[in-house]
Swiss-Prot record:
Self-association state and partner proteins as the record states: Tetramer of two alpha and two beta subunits.
Protein name: Phenylalanine--tRNA ligase alpha subunit
Protein family per UniProt: Belongs to the class-II aminoacyl-tRNA synthetase family. Phe-tRNA synthetase alpha subunit type 1 subfamily.
Family annotation (Gene3D superfamilies): Bira Bifunctional Protein, Domain 2
BP GO terms, sorted: phenylalanyl-tRNA aminoacylation
Coiled coil, from the record: none
Localization, UniProt: Cytoplasm
Domain of life: Bacteria
Cofactors, names only: Mg(2+)
Length: 338
């Protein structure tokens, strides 16, 4: 009977060693140590033996049971480790391989034009100044020679947050804040978002504006014309033709609207330019002495010019876009063209 136990042990150990999966190992465990397993049946048959035989064979059978249980646990550990290694090997990444290519994003067309404008002025010595989008009535209007009862306030609608707090309607307040902090000479542009309650094919409640300011001794309207001529030719091409029309802005005197020959019809007249052959592009003028006085500059000693342009307006003309609202609809087919 001892030989039978030894043979059972050898056979069980061989099957344990041959098991490659957790399922195979579980089947071997049930075959030998389960309720109806071979070793379990042997232990149950000990009741037919004498007391001395029970002690001898029972002790040996329990030793084999302990040994086999240990073998099963060891095999279970090995199989689990091999399984984990196999999973890790299957999921391993070769970090030396090139990554998956992905489509590159691109800057929004308005951002592209804004960055181009800022780059042009930065190259000729202008600094970029920024300010708050929520402004006081003073900086947005009064400091710019637009008192509360001034009819110029009717020239543009305004979002009022509170009675004396507005969403800025232009970036001109940045010029006032800069001049309050800095003595001449001043040479800045102030790009940023501005707000007016208006919405149609050529207006949106929020749009981007760039305003420029240059203050020093001896600055003339000729300097303004030369700067804007060079700037617009760099934006639209050397063949660009400009004209200056007298206009009115409360913070500049004299003031001028700047037009360029229509980039669509080349001055022949079309729907875009209203058959005039010209496109309004920006406003400009010499800084009004009253504005200088508001910031503590002596208008007898210093002069300067200012100008302002809508970035979306430039982008529309540059790319031939007829509806400003397309910029803000997040339509991929439209945006991917730029």
């Amino acid at each position: 009977m001892i030989e039978d136990l030894k043979e059972l042990q050898n056979k069980a150990e061989a099957e344990i060693k041959a098991a490659k999966t957790e399922t195979d190992l579980a089947a071997v465990r049930v075959r030998y140590l389960g309720r109806k397993g071979l070793l379990t049946q042997f232990l149950r048959n000990l009741g037919q033996l004498s007391i001395e035989e029970k002690q001898i064979f029972g002790k040996r059978a329990n030793e084999i049971k302990t040994i086999l249980s240990s073998r099963f646990d060891e095999a279970q550990t090995v199989i689990a480790a091999l399984k984990k290694e196999s999973v890790l090997r299957a999921e391993a990444l070769d970090v030396t391989l090139p990554g998956r290519s992905s489509g590159y994003g691109r800057a929004h067309p308005v951002t592209q034009v804004l960055e181009e404008i800022c780059a042009i002025f930065s190259e000729i010595g202008f600094s970029i100044a920024e300010g708050p989008e929520i402004e006081s009535d003073y900086y947005n209007f009064e400091a710019l020679n637009i008192p509360k009862d001034h009819p110029a306030r009717d020239m543009q609608d305004t979002f009022y947050v509170e009675e004396a707090i507005v969403l800025r309607t232009h970036t001109s307040p940045v010029q006032i804040r800069t001049m309050e902090k800095q003595s001449p000479p001043v040479k800045i542009i102030s790009p940023g978002r501005v707000y007016r309650p208006d919405s149609d094919v050529s207006h949106t409640p929020m749009f981007h504006q760039v305003e420029g300011l240059l203050v020093d001794r001896g600055i003339t309207f000729g300097d303004l014309k030369g700067l804007l001529n060079a700037f617009l030719k760099q934006i639209f091409g050397e063949e660009t033709v400009l004209r200056f029309r007298p206009s009115y802005f409360p913070f500049t005197e004299p003031s001028a609207e700047v037009d360029i020959r229509c980039v669509i019809c080349r001055g022949k007249g079309c729907r875009v330019c209203g058959q005039s052959g010209w496109l309004e592009i920006l406003g400009s003028g010499m800084v009004d002495p009253a504005v200088f006085e508001n910031v503590g500059y002596d208008p007898e000693e210093y002069s300067g010019f200012a100008f302002g342009l809508g970035v979306e307006r430039i982008a529309m003309l540059k790319y031939g876009i007829t509806d400003i609202r397309l910029f803000f609809e997040n339509e991929r087919r439209f945006l991917q063209q730029f």
